[in-house]
Amino acid sequence: MLKLTLALAALALAASCSQEPSAPKRNPRLPEPSALAATMQAMTADMEALKIKAQAGTLTLSDVESLRMAHESIKTDQPTKPEDIKESFPGFAEAYLANLDNLYEAIKNQGDVEAQIEAFNAVISTCESCHQQHCPGPLERIGGIKAAALVP
C-alpha cells in the first residue's frame, strides 16, 4: 500500500511539473485598464525595448514606423478617468507623435548615433512633460527609458 501511495504521489508530482506555466492572473478586483492606459503600457514597453537600439545607433525606419502606427491611437483612446485629462493632453499627444516623426527623420537622414539618441530622448521628454501635468506616477520609470548620451 505504501508503495502504491508513493507511486501515485510521484506520478502526480511529475504531471504537475510537466504542465506549461499558466499566464499570470489579473487581480479580479482591479478593473481592466482603459484604452489609453493600455496604449501607454505598450508605449512604455516599446520604448524600453528600443532604448538599446537607440544607444547603439541601430534604430531603423521600420522600428519608428511601427511605433507611430501602434501609438497613433493615443489621440483618441479613452482614459481611465476622463475628468483627470486636462485641455493640454491633445497637444502632448500630438507632440509625442511629432517627436516620433523627428526621430524617423534623424534615422532617414542617416544622422549619427548622437543625433538619434537626442531625437529618441526628445520623444521620452514629451512623455515626461505630459506626465508632470496629468499622471505623475510613472515619471521615474519614464525617465529611466532615456538613452545615455555617448561619452566622447
Stretch-by-stretch model annotation:
Residues 18-152:
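Sequence context surrounding c-type heme c attachment/ligation sites in exported
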Residues 1-7:
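Bacterial N-terminal signal peptides that target proteins for export
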Residues 10:
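Active-site-proximal loop/hinge segments that shape catalytic or ion-binding/gating pockets
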Residues 14-16:
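C-terminal motif of bacterial Sec signal peptides marking the signal peptidase cleavage site
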